[in-house]
């Protein structure tokens, strides 16, 4: 924290705290606190640490990839204690954090008018200037939409991987040829960020002059949202 405050955040209106009580009391009421921690038990643990220091009507926002059923439970728990809770799906990664993300909030509806100007100000903007952030609905609906969003994205990634496999192993195309095909697809109906970066990845060479794609392990990790989407589809 101190390295960030004294580094990239230096000269900006950003303060760092190591004590939760001190952090909470530094915020004017009704407080809006956004949690960006790993989904799962870490969210519950942080909430339990925050609860004793909150005032009635304060708002907690979970911006992680939480399971929507966990968000359903957390909304009910927070409201029972007199607080409000927003489960906000956030898409965009590091680039989105710096230049605007897509944000999908849901939960305690009375919180929306208060967090709307904040979330929409940091959201990406469409070509007509519309913020990529609108209220989704009650309880865990925001995280449900993020789950479906990720499920669709992973499906697209699998299609791209299969197209790559066919071109490489059945058609015998090299990386340069495949990059041109993906770049061509990106000029038409298939245009998308994933298609665009696939072409760029296939072109990329490392310091030795070899294609980096040929040195990457053929495996991928996941945070659970794709699996949850498939389970919900089956149910």
Please give the residue ranges for each predicted region:
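Short acidic alpha-helix initiation/capping motifs at coil-to-helix transition points
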Residues: 2, 155-158, 220-227
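A conserved active-site cap/scaffold subdomain adjacent to cofactor or substrate pockets
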Residues: 214-235
